[in-house]
Amino acid sequence: MADLKGQVALVTGASRGVGRGVAVGLAHAGATVFATGRSIKQTEFGAGIISIVCDHTDDQAVEAVFRQVEASTGRLDMLVNVAWGGYERMVENGEFTYIAPFWQQPLWRWDAMVTTGARAAFVASQHAARLMVSARRGLIVNISFWAAQKYLGNTVYGIAKAAMDKMTSDMAHELKSHGVTAVSLYPGLVRTEAVLAANCFDLSNSESPEFIGRVIAALAADPNVSSRNGATLVAAAVALEYGVTDVDGRRPRPLTLADV
């Protein structure tokens, strides 16, 4: 397991799902983790994780989070942008509007995915970069998905994920000379609370939320992680490179564009 003792991470959107799993995975690797979410509760986490209630569409609240991190630890080594929106209310007035063509999409979904997702990641990355650039170290991980490269049933989703990947690439260009690395990371099918509740997915090649945290921990512990700056990475493929297994000991098969 990667050793992140002495390192400080901030994980956004950690109330549940992938974000929660990332926070737990990084804490298990020894990092001090600040975990944010609109409905997050400290009692749900163990040692090594400090929860902060934060709505990432509120710029002042986000700024306060970073002030708290800096005041508490004096450093920030990792930012993992997981906060997202737009999956709620997939069915409206009896219709599955999530897969409606773009001209029939409710505009609140654009606001949720682009504002709660891409814009929130940009704002958090701005604050993180200010701490990391001055220290000449740091890793920013933007959780993204194949919808950035292929139509997956929702135009807004594709636009928002493409924005995440382009943001990663351009941020990496500007961060390169400052010792800071930025990457996009694609999970596979993750056994989140929502996926398990749906009870309609083939979970034979699925990943636990904690698996994504283990992968990020391995990246953060790699002294040569800067060689990946600006890259789009597949979590399961990175896991194979570093010998990372899931919590049940399995090694999920990496997905490709043809698989999704």
For each feature predicted by the language model, list its residue ranges.
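Active-site loop of short-chain dehydrogenase/reductase
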Residues: 7, 75-76, 97, 132-144, ...
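Rossmann-fold cofactor-recognition segment
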Residues: 47-60
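Conserved glycine-rich cofactor-binding loop
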Residues: 8, 15-16
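C-terminal helical subdomain
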Residues: 184, 201-260
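A short, exposed helix-loop element centered on a Lys and neighboring polar residues
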Residues: 125-126, 169
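Conserved glycine-rich Rossmann-like NAD(P)H-binding loop of the short-chain dehydrogenase/reductase
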Residues: 29-44
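Catalytic loop of short-chain dehydrogenase/reductase
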Residues: 85-86, 99-109, 139-163, 168-177, ...
